[in-house]
């Protein structure tokens, strides 16, 4: 594969870059004059066209150049801001290329390959006046000679602009922003002034004691030079100023001191034994395998800002719950585990494709992990019925403030538990509003791929398809949003009246908040039907959504299960009333669906997210159940695969009476049409209760 990957693959791009580079470096430049203004290093349009007519056959052999094509090429270079007019007219639209006009280059040879670094806008440059680089203005008018009293463009900032000297300022250092300058050379420093004599009778006072105290204070002040909040005036009297930006952007002083101590130890050739983690450490119990040894300089809480590698840091509790790092080196026995887990992924995708009756999305299928499926189906906590965590220790699924708000609403009115110590007396509606707005900025358990797959499955039922097609948002119903809002105006209102207590600046605060809002759909109050209309009676649809939820990563499966349980506890709590007429909710159930759907789904329309949330609430026990028949089928295939590879030269292990025996295989079902039954049979049919349902009853 490395032999196929060469520059021949991008021949047009390399050829275009070569033409630009050759044109910029070899075209003869001179000083042109028009009226009272002159432009150095400029050229006429006719000279550029003649140059291309001569040089283009040398770059591209067997090619006859035409003057019209060369003019179009120079027009394209004007669009790419490579060249521009030296004496432009004050018109809004740029004039087309002409051979009679004068042009100059807007980019140097280095800028054609590497863009210029731009400095950050800051209120203080502190020690950065030698190292800061400010981008030069793109206006070609800055390179012209002007008469002394010519009008300059009205630019208020004095940091970078109004350059009235010929040519571009090619100095390596940046332009000082005198608007933020904090000292004057003519002014005497405050410490060097003579003391102000308030009483004229003390004019014979001796100033020698004052000068001695000033020297002592300067000696004390040098102790704090390493602090990150030193003033920018500190080094302005020194000849050689430091080139670093500021101490707050550099590495921590404690880390520097520790590195100096390590360098001193190395110079003395004193070797210390390496740090080894205990073999029974918690990190080694993680299913993804152990981490490399942590360097000694990261053992303290202060870590280096410059050049810190997150993959080498020790795994924290919060970090475990957020993501499973792919940079962790797996253990040696993981190959066999992955081979065994491939049965789970293959069977789940095959069964789901059989029910879906079409090809599954490749983006979603490639992210499914067989280990997650096996863990989600087998490792279930018998206390609450939620799948166990794959990490050791405590893993919070949400930030601590969100957990406190959810705990407050679940345990309200605190009859059997201790009241939450928040320090303030919160109102229930105020807590709920804050929780709604916080959830918009967090990652939801159901991402874009899962949401689109569940919506397509629900649209196979006419009643659910009608819910998406009806209403004022009909033209947006089947459009999944996959990118952030293209403009600020699209943000509009936030989620339905729950955000009235937030300031206006909070609308643009989060990309997830903008992504959840659409220009039309999410502003409209959508009608929520009764709970029975969201119940699923088709067994094939229940099984399909079960498999989609079981294919989630374990952390997201746990998060979704806990959050839907939390919504159920809110909608059944009759002590408080969360209904708000401004968003169309008349009871707690409607208010929870309207406000909390962003905690279930992400990157989808409001109508689709509310439908998925309502379906999960109405069919909670059946959708979060574990299909026992599917587990038995996969285990049977695993046993057949093991028996196939066990040869006659190895003695077969006799199974005891308690070992699992494969049941009789079921007949395969072809498509969702096989599952369709008459209305009488559907009415009389009782839904099969799985293992998870029996656990919930206990």
From Swiss-Prot:
InterPro entries: DEP_dom, WH-like_DNA-bd_sf, WH_DNA-bd_sf. Residues 146-157 have a biased composition (Basic residues). It comes from the Eukaryota. Required for the proper orientation of spindles after the establishment of polarity. May play a role in interactions between the astral microtubules and the cortical cytoskeleton. Required for asymmetric forces on nuclei and spindles. Acts downstream of the PAR signaling as an intermediate that transduces polarity information to the machinery that positions the mitotic spindle, possibly by regulating force generation. Regulates gpr-1/2 asymmetric cortical localization during the first embryonic cell divisions. Acts antagonistically to the gpr-1/2 signaling pathway. Its main location: cytoplasm. SMART domains: DEP. One of its GO terms (biological process) is intracellular signal transduction. This is Protein let-99. It holds the Pfam family DEP. Keywords: Cell cycle, Cell division, Cytoplasm, Developmental protein, Mitosis. Residues 115-188, 653-672 are annotated as: Disordered. It comes from Caenorhabditis elegans. GO terms for cellular component: cell cortex. Residues 178-188 have a biased composition (Basic and acidic residues). It is found in: Cytoplasm; Cytoplasm, Cell cortex. The keyword Nucleus does not apply. Residues 23-107 form the DEP domain.
């Amino acid at each position: 594969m490395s032999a196929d990957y060469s520059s021949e693959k991008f021949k047009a791009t390399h050829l275009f870059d070569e033409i630009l580079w050759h044109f910029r470096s070899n075209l003869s430049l001179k000083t042109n004059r028009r009226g009272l203004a002159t432009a150095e290093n400029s050229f006429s349009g006719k000279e550029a066209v003649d140059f291309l007519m001569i040089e283009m056959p040398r770059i591209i052999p067997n090619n006859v150049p035409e003057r019209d094509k060369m003019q179009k090429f120079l027009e394209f270079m004007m669009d790419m801001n490579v060249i521009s007019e030296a004496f432009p007219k004050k018109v809004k639209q740029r004039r087309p290329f002409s051979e009679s006009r004068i042009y100059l280059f807007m980019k140097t040879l280095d800028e054609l390959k590497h863009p210029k670094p731009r400095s950050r806008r800051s209120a203080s440059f502190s020690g950065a006046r030698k190292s800061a680089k400010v981008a030069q203005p793109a206006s070609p008018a800055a390179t012209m000679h002007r008469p002394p009293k010519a009008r300059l463009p009205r630019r208020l900032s004095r940091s970078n602009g109004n350059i009235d000297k010929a040519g571009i300022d090619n100095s390596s250092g940046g332009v000082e922003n005198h608007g933020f300058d904090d000292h004057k050379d003519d002014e005497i420093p405050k410490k060097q002034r003579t003391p102000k004599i308030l009483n004229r009778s003390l004019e014979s006072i001796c100033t020698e004691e004052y000068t001695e105290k000033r020297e002592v204070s300067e000696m004390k002040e040098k102790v704090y030079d390493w602090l990150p909040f030193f003033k920018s005036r500190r080094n302005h009297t020194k000849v050689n100023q430091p080139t670093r930006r500021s101490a707050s952007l550099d590495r921590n002083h404690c880390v520097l001191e520790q590195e100096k101590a390590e360098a001193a130890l190395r110079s003395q050739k004193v070797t210390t034994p390496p740090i080894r983690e205990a073999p029974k450490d918690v990190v080694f119990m993680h299913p993804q395998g152990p981490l490399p040894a942590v360097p000694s300089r990261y053992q303290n809480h202060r870590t280096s800002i410059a050049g810190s590698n997150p993959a080498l840091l020790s795994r924290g509790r919060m970090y475990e719950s957020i993501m499973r790092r792919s940079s962790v080196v797996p253990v040696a026995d993981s190959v066999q585990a992955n081979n065994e887990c491939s049965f789970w992924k293959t069977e789940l995708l095959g069964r789901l494709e059989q029910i879906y009756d079409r090809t599954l999305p490749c983006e979603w299928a490639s992210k499914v992990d067989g280990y997650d499926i096996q863990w989600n189906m087998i490792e279930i906590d018998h206390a609450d019925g939620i799948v166990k965590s794959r990490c050791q220790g405590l893993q919070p699924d949400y930030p601590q403030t969100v957990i406190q708000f959810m705990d407050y609403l679940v345990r309200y009115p605190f009859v059997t538990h201790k009241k939450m110590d928040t320090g303030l007396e919160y109102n229930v509606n105020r807590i709920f509003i804050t929780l709604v707005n916080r959830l918009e900025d967090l990652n939801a358990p159901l991402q874009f791929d899962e949401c689109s797959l569940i919506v397509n499955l629900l649209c196979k039922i006419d009643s659910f398809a009608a819910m998406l097609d009806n209403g004022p948002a009909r033209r947006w119903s089947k459009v999944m949003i996959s990118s952030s809002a293209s403009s600020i105006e699209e943000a509009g209102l936030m989620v339905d009246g729950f955000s009235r207590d937030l300031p206006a600046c909070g609308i643009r605060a989060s990309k997830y908040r903008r992504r959840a809002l659409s220009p039309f759909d999410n502003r409209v109050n959508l009608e929520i039907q009764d709970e029975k209309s969201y119940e699923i009676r088709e067994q094939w649809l229940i099984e399909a959504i079960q498999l989609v939820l079981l294919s989630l990563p374990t952390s997201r499966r746990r998060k979704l299960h806990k959050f839907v349980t939390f919504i159920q506890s809110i909608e059944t709590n009759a002590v408080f009333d969360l209904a708000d007429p401004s968003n169309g909710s008349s009871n707690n159930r409607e208010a929870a669906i309207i406000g909390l759907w962003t905690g279930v789904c992400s990157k989808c329309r409001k109508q689709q997210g509310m439908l998925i949330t309502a379906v999960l609430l109405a069919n909670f026990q059946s959708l979060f159940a574990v299909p026992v028949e599917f587990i038995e089928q996969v285990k049977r295939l695993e046993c057949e695969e093991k028996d196939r590879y066990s040869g006659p030269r190895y003695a077969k292990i006799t199974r005891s009476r308690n070992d699992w025996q494969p049941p009789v295989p079921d007949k395969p079902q072809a498509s969702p049409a096989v599952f369709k039954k008459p209305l009488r049979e559907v009415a009389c049919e009782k839904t099969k209760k799985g293992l998870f349902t029996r656990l919930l009853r206990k």
